[in-house]
Each structure stands twice: as C-alpha cells, then as structure tokens.
C-alpha cells in the first residue's frame, strides 16, 4: 500500500499534530467540529523530511496525491485553479508541530496569472482588488519561492506611488495597480531571464517545495536550535482556499491573542488592518491599524 502524504482537512484531527503540524491538525479538528473553516488540504511533515533528505525533489507519488487533493478542493469550491472565468485562489502556508511564528514562509493569492486575474476582476466586479491581489502574489512568489529580494519590488512600488502622488497603497487605483503588476512582472523577467510562471499547478508545486525548504532557512535554523526543536520533525504545508482582506473597506485582516503578550493578563488582545492582507499585519504596516 502506498504511503499517504496528503490529507484533506476532513481526514485529520487534533491528535495528528506530528504528521499534520499544529496548524494542519487544528484546521482538521475545526473542520470536523463543523466550524466554518475555509477548506483545504495538508501535505505532511513526512513529505517534508523525504523532500529535504531526497535531493530537494517531490516524488511522483507526492505530486499525484497533491493533484488528487487539489481536484477534490476544486470540486468542493466550485472553482478551478487558473480558471479564466471563476478562478480558485489558495494560500500556501507552513505548519510545524511546534509553533514557530514568523520563521517560515507563506504565499497568498496563488493561482493568479494574466488570464485568471481578468476572470477574478469580472467575477467580483472589482478590478482594483484583482490586480492588488496579483501584484502581491508576484512579489510573494518571487521572494519566497525564487529568492528575488522583496526590496526590489518595494522600491519600485514606492517610486510609482511617488510618481502619481499616492501616499499609501490603498490610494492606488485599479489602473495604477495594473501598471504596478506590469512593473513587478518586468522585475521578475529581468532577474530570472524568463517570464513569471503562468501555470497554476506549477505555481502550487513550487510554493509547496519553498515551504519545505524554509524549514531549513537561517531564521528557522536558529529558532529550532534555541528552542530544542529537532530537524527531523519537518514542517507540513497547508493549502487552503483564500479569504480576502483586501476587497475594500468592509474587509480586513488581523491577529488576536487570548492573553496580553506584554503583561500576561488573561484578556483578549489583537489588532487589525482594513483593506489589507495578512502579511501587512506581520510586516508592521501602520496605516489603518486598529487595536481591540
């Protein structure tokens, strides 16, 4: 019997932390409790270990199981990755069995390309949102998956904002963001000598491998050593339907804690940003930041 590397959220539970990582196990548990969790699947920590010890390659068996899980996710969502009319977009996140906040990598809005971005714009009636998501994806993918410095994109974005008199990202119009997207694609082309990848399944596999590699990045290495986390544990990869915080002023993103991190007081504490995505909170963007 072939080894199982990929688990739909409905196939796991909280007791499978070693295999699915903390995030994957808890997402599975919440799914099985009937909570409204955006659906997805988890690629196991065992796949990570075999990837890193086997020449940094996904086996054919792993790829086959990822494709089967993706097909199930598409069926549940009623959308397809890369579809020109109703595209499915996913996030790709790490999830080790021990909490390692900020140590490993995340890719959001995966599945966008030059065709599906137009489908997203038409489906949502929000062209600005579609191109905001695409330019974010290009920068994240280039940085996390390929290793193109994020600062190259941030510098060009700042230059563009200055040229049009925009103080904040949220001041940019749909047409502005189309131009920023083209600028970002050119940065990728200049750096890599090839166009930004347009095949969504290729994007997904590359992002999953990048998360596996991030288990061994310098930040994660130091954190593991400081916290006695064995290398052999590996990290899982969680692929989940996107929920968007950047669709306008009625959406947002945030973090919440059950205790005050500074004092230890048992009280809810958090902060959020309106019309933003999760990485903006982590990156320390201050505009629109509110505390709860």
Per-segment meaning from a language model:
Residues 1-289:
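Nucleotide/phosphate-binding sheet-loop regions of phosphoryl- and nucleotidyl-transfer enzymes
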